[in-house]
Amino acid sequence: MAEKRERVAYPLTFLLKKEGDLWASLACEVDVASCGDTREEAREMLKEAVALYVTDMVESGELDKVARPVPKDGLVEFATDPPGEMHIEYHTLLVSLSAVPPTLEFLPSMVRPADCQPAVAAA
């Protein structure tokens, strides 16, 4: 029987790219995108979009299907078309499964609490 998880951590790579007057943002590990007028707004809008996606997956009982990486050609297109200033950020999304709805918290720089299981088992 699988062990019931209380908290799960999802490591996320955010790509933030200047496209004309806007900033586009992409969470690579979950194939969720957003945008904003500034880099900071694009980051916050992406966090909100990722949180909505993960909450929906958890509430639908599809926790194991949350990770769905952006296809390689999608990454290449995001990075190169059109060319623009690009920033890469690393975050961890901490999901507490004991609450309904689940509670989510973004941690910077790949921080993961010691009592939290990774979302994807190491190979």
What feature does the model see in each segment?
Residues 1, 23-26, 32, 121-122:
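Residue-level detector of intrinsically disordered, flexible termini
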